[in-house]
């Protein structure tokens, strides 16, 4: 055997995964998929099946996340990248900050632990997702999302057609359902609150667009997924859901415009057509009444607030609460509903509703601006890397996934609402995984 052949053999041997590490990686991927499905089904268990233990079920995903973190670090599946090092360092600093809040403000340790969980537990899970998922795993989660969209669309349609008092519109704790207009509910699907369903709609639309740009994905799945997504979008009664649809649609058509019309890409172009026809056609043909109701709600809301100003204020208001928060904040986790429940026995949102100012109020100027700065920088980096993927390989999947997760990283209530937290960090990890595995698309 020649020296060159020997070196090639050694290189090939180094490229092959260690059997034990590969087995552990597959287990972690399975845990990720289980966690994702539980994110969608958790609300149904809490409000319909097992309401007496709904508080405990809120944490039903956490053991699977803990096991995935354990396997990942035990088998060294994650590298110490700058992002991982920064996240670890910041999480340790927040532990000391929480200890300060316990001593200085007599804050309940459970509140601090809950707050730390919201800030970092699923951030580490996102880093695990980025490290272990291959492009085939990313594609599988996308397909699962489209499959789930079909029964979710049917459930949303039933909720939309049913009166607010119907069992299918039952709210956790027996509260009144949110309405679009008189007698018409804002659907929640399997989720306990409208914010969760909005995240489902936004994530499904991003997955739908990504599937349309993926060779080998069933066009029937894209078409039926588009029908389910259109139903969920039309019946959501949410301006934020339509914003997600608009952002994803604009990015999808921009991606389509820059890709070459080559014979080997005809299947991809057909997928984009199926997605567009299924989504827009379904909305206009089957849900004109829902669109009229949404237009009425938007008109009423515009008379009370300017959406553009509110969007801008959600960015700027974090810099205006420094005098109230001080350098070290008022209490890690104290501004959330779950944190206030642990601290006072009553669930109440005692601080700002918008994410940026509430994070600063909880953790202070130093740590609050640092944490939000990490989210802003990560968003910018993912956007740039996703653009590089489409320029270098015509791989649109990372950019389309960015269309959902970046708005959540920028302004989403990720440290306040459990489902938003799960969706935001899981899809951040999925986007990072798609970026990391973009080179695999050249081999397919």
Q: Where on the chain are the PLM-derived regions?
A:
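A membrane-periplasm/extracellular boundary helix in multi-pass inner-membrane enzymes
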Residues: 4, 154, 160-164, 253-302, ...
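Interfacial loop-to-transmembrane-helix boundary motif in multi-pass membrane proteins
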Residues: 28-32, 37, 83-93, 128-164
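N-terminal hydrophobic segments of proteins, predominantly signal-anchor/transmembrane helices
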Residues: 28-47, 62-120, 408
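Loop-to-helix entry and N-terminal half of a specific, functionally important transmembrane alpha helix
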Residues: 31-38, 382-414
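Transmembrane alpha-helices of multi-pass inner-membrane enzymes
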Residues: 68, 399-444
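Membrane-interfacial entry segments at the cytosolic side of transmembrane helices
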Residues: 137-146, 217-223, 260-275, 395
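Alpha-helical transmembrane segments of multi-pass inner-membrane proteins
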Residues: 143-170, 179-182, 189-258
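Long extracytoplasmic/lumenal interhelical loops at the membrane interface
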Residues: 292-365, 382-387
């Amino acid at each position: 055997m020649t020296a060159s052949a020997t070196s090639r053999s050694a290189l090939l041997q180094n490229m092959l995964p260690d059997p034990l590490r590969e087995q552990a990686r597959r287990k972690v991927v399975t845990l990720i998929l289980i966690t994702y499905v539980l994110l969608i089904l958790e609300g149904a268990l809490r409000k319909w099946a097992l309401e007496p233990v709904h508080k405990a079920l809120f944490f039903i995903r956490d053991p699977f996340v803990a096991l995935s973190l354990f396997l990942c670090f035990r088998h060294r599946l994650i590298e110490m990248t700058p992002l991982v090092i920064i996240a670890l360092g910041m999480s340790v600093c927040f532990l000391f900050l929480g200890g300060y809040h316990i001593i200085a403000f007599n804050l309940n340790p459970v509140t601090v632990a809950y707050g730390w969980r919201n800030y970092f537990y699923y951030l580490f899970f996102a880093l695990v997702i980025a490290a272990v998922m291959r492009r085939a795993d990313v594609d599988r989660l996308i397909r699962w999302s489209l499959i789930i969209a079909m029964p979710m669309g049917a459930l949303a349609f039933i909720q939309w057609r049913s009166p607010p008092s119907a069992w299918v519109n039952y709210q956790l704790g027996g509260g009144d359902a949110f309405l679009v207009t008189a007698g018409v509910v804002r659907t929640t699907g399997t989720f306990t609150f409208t914010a969760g369903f909005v995240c489902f709609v936004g994530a499904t639309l991003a997955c739908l667009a990504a599937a349309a740009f993926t060779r080998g994905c069933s066009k029937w799945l894209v078409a039926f997924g588009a029908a389910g997504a259109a139903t969920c979008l039309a019946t959501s009664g949410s301006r934020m859901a339509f914003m997600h649809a608009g952002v994803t649609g604009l990015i999808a058509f921009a991606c389509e415009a820059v890709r070459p019309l080559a014979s080997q890409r005809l299947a991809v172009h057909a997928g984009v057509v199926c997605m567009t026809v299924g989504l827009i056609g379904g909305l206009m043909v089957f849900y004109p009444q829902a669109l009229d109701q949404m237009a009425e709600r938007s008109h009423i809301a515009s008379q009370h607030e300017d959406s553009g100003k509110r969007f801008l204020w959600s960015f700027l208001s974090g810099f205006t609460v420094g005098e109230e928060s001080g350098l070290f904040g008022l209490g890690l986790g104290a501004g959330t509903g779950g944190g206030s429940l642990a601290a006072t026995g009553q669930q109440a949102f005692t601080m700002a509703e918008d994410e940026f100012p509430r994070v600063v109020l909880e953790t202070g100027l130093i740590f609050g601006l640092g944490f939000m700065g990490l989210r802003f920088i990560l968003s910018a980096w993912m956007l740039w890397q996703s653009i590089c993927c489409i320029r270098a390989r015509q791989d649109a999947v990372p950019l389309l996934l960015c269309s959902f997760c970046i708005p959540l990283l920028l302004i989403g209530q990720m440290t306040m609402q459990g489902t938003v937290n799960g969706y935001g960090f899981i899809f951040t990890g999925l986007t990072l995984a798609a970026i990391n595995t973009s080179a695999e698309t050249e081999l397919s």
